[in-house]
């Protein structure tokens, strides 16, 4: 589990992803495949830490209700119980879920049309 959600990743992969996110410092992470949502929660929590680090370095106050970074999860079949659990999680403000195929041109266009700022329309 990662923060209460099952995660389907090897520990070594989790460490590698964390190192990559720290180095790249992305504003948006797009994940294909949601399953139970553990990886979405992992990515959202790592982005939350980046926001905290940025605020600390800048000497500004961080408002957790206004995240600067977000995660978008795309899955062809988001199970209702998994969607509900992800939407109820404290990291939900950082997560947007899109149901559809990640190779569908309409889904790709929707992703590209979204603003980079975090959304709360899980």
Descriptions of predicted regions:
Residues 3-8, 12-122:
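S-adenosylmethionine/decaboxylated-SAM
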